[in-house]
Amino acid sequence: MAQTQVKATEGVLEGKDLSGITVFKGVPFAAPPVGNLRWKAPQPAAHWDGVREAKEYGPNPMQEPIYGDMNFGTKVNSEDCLYLNIWTPAKTMKEHLPVLIYFNGGGLMAGSGSEARYAGDAMARKGIISITANYREGIFGYFAHPQLSKETDYKGSGNYGFMDQVAAIRWVKDNIEAFGGDPNRITIVGESAGSMSVSALMASPLCQGLFAQAMGSSGSVMGFQKIATLKEAEDKGVALAQKILLEKGKKTGKKVGKDAGKKCLDELRAMPAEELLKLASVRALPVYNVDGYFFTEQPTEVFAKGNQTKVALLVGGNNQEMTPMSVLRGKQPTVENLKEGAKALFGEENIDGLFRLYGINSDKDVLEQPGVDLASDMFLDYATWKWGNMHKLTGGQPVYRYRYCHPRPAMAIKGKVAALAGGVVDAKEGAAPVRRDNGAVHSADIEYAMATLPTNRVFDWQPEDYMVSDIFSQYYVNFVKTGNPNGLGLPEWPAINGKAVAPVMQIDVETEKAADYTCLQFFRYPVSKESYKEKRNTCNARKNADSADL
């Protein structure tokens, strides 16, 4: 029988035995960020007397049903959301097991540690402690404003969701020995916005010494553009506050001045969370910023100087992260329309060279792999590659790259279509059947990596899916245990450090080494007619490199 009572800093917790492992759900790692604590750094959780039951998930963070396909373990959303969940196989405090902390994806505006695909029981049965932790999202987690900045010693604001993640890691480091864990063997992990968070945590001075390894899947905060300055974030916060007050004024009949958004903090703090969420109604990636506290400079500058947390890193993404339709924005799939969609990011003068580099030469290329490669790089692939590459150059620690390639099987249910967050939404009446993906779409890797395929009943999982999951999840577990994904019976996975042609592990039914590439790594500067051929040839050489040479 596993030990179900544990003494944490704040008091005694009573968990639940799951046939050899113990799960503790809804464990508070910080005070509820409500009332006057709205838009403040997380504060310590309160102590309690007696035994606190930890058998049910705490509330999800406040969020709108943006994706419509997330499978939560609780139906309750609340501003009081700073809870974590622990799955431990330890029988005593003295086992010193390695620890995984998973931060959910969802664009920093949706998602929760209660989602079934992140559940840690399968990983715990492989000999590690697995943890999920919530953090504030959307306007509750990433709202900057001049009035908020005046309240802080560092004269900045925003980034509260990232600070929640720091608080969760600190709580785990301070308490995990009581659950049989090793505070010096913590690995932080995330997918999509969770992966962006891991890269941000590595760049923050608040995290030095808090974790031993890091893993990221499909995302980083080091993309094509710099993150916002504090002034830019504050200005956007004022504009959002003005929008909220105007929307409320329409309902109440109250007249709102043109500068009301500049001095409205008391009113916004007093607003019920549900009302604030609806009035803000922002369905875009929140604005995080160089606030002078969580971020003291641009993350790219931190990594360029070698000032990031220097730990082993396992990083990668999927081979079909995004469809070209995201670049086309509703227009027909032609080269000219795809160029028009890409110009906003790359500029008119660069677009022809860029398309030659990708091999997008005719309309048929637009929806095929060349167009998919461009759309995926624009979405998250390039940012993910840049994170791993910069850490390779200045981190002084091993970096392991992967590319997840295995497509999900056919759906087990009818009348649905797959959505971005991993689940399904209702198919539109009369819509043409959606063809099965040729590769791994965004978020498709999560259940395979976390060995949680049975929790997702949308897809008709086949033996080959479980085989891929066994391989991928074992790489994950090995990395958490040792900082190296390699292990007995697995294909060799070399680090990319010191390699002219960096190796990437292609995770599939046939898992093997290949060449690590993204065409955009050769597109750091405008492509002249004289240089694009050389760049294109180099990109193709990396694509076609013989794995035996890696």
Indicate residue ranges for each PLM-predicted region:
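Mobile gating loops/cap/lid regions near enzyme active sites that modulate substrate access
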Residues: 385, 389-550
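Non-catalytic accessory segments of hydrolases
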Residues: 1-159, 183, 459-472, 482-490, ...
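Alpha/beta-hydrolase active-site loop
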Residues: 81, 154-177, 232-235, 239
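Active-site rim elements
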Residues: 69-74, 154-159, 222-228, 299-300, ...
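Substrate-access "cap/lid" subdomains that shape
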Residues: 70, 174, 200, 208, ...
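Primarily recognizes the serine-hydrolase "nucleophile elbow" in alpha/beta-hydrolase
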Residues: 184-225
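Active-site loop->helix "elbow" adjoining a glycine-rich segment at hydrolase catalytic centers
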Residues: 105, 164, 192-195
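Loop/turn elements at helix/coil->beta-strand transitions in domains of secreted/extracellular proteins
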Residues: 95-99, 126-131, 182-186, 207-213, ...
